[in-house]
From Swiss-Prot:
Belongs to the complex I LYR family. SDHAF3 subfamily. It comes from Nematostella vectensis. Keywords: Chaperone, Mitochondrion, Transit peptide. This is Succinate dehydrogenase assembly factor 3, mitochondrial. Interacts with the iron-sulfur protein subunit within the SDH catalytic dimer. PANTHER family: DC11 ACN9 HOMOLOG, SUCCINATE DEHYDROGENASE ASSEMBLY FACTOR 3, MITOCHONDRIAL.
Length: 115
C-alpha cells in the first residue's frame, strides 16, 4: 500500500531539513534536529490549511539554510524576525520561540569557563 502524495512530500521535506542540518555546527545541528522532529510530530494531525502553511514555512526555512550553508560566509546563520511576524504569533508560538532562543544561546558546557 502506498502512502498518500502529501505524506511523501512531508517526509521528503523532513529528510531535506535533516540533511541540511548535517552541514551546521554540531550544537546547532542537534538543536535543529530536535526542533524539527518535535514540530513535524506536533503537526501530524494538522488541518489541511495548517498543513499547507506548515509546509510553506518549512520550505522557506530549508531554502534559507541551504543558501546560508552554501555561501562563503559560514558564520552567518539564521535570520532576523520582522516585528509584524513576531506580533502575529500566538502565545504558544511565542513560548516556543523563547525556549528555542534560550537553547540556542545557552553556553556550551564542554568549554572551560573562567572562574
Amino acid at each position: 500500500m502506498s502512502l498518500p502524495r502529501h505524506t511523501l512530500a512531508i517526509q521528503a521535506l523532513y529528510r531535506r531539513v535533516l540533511k541540511l542540518h548535517r552541514k551546521l555546527p554540531l550544537e546547532i545541528k542537534a538543536l535543529g534536529d530536535q526542533y524539527a522532529k518535535d514540530e513535524f510530530r506536533r503537526h501530524k494531525k494538522a488541518s489541511q490549511e495548517q498543513a499547507v502553511r506548515f509546509m510553506q514555512e518549512w520550505k522557506i526555512y530549508a531554502d534559507t539554510i541551504e543558501q546560508q550553508v552554501n555561501s562563503q560566509q559560514l558564520n552567518v546563520l539564521g535570520k532576523d524576525l520582522k516585528d509584524e511576524h513576531i506580533e502575529s504569533l500566538t502565545e504558544e508560538q511565542l513560548g516556543q520561540l523563547y525556549s528555542l532562543q534560550e537553547a540556542a544561546l545557552k553556553p556550551d558546557s564542554s568549554e572551560p569557563r573562567d572562574i
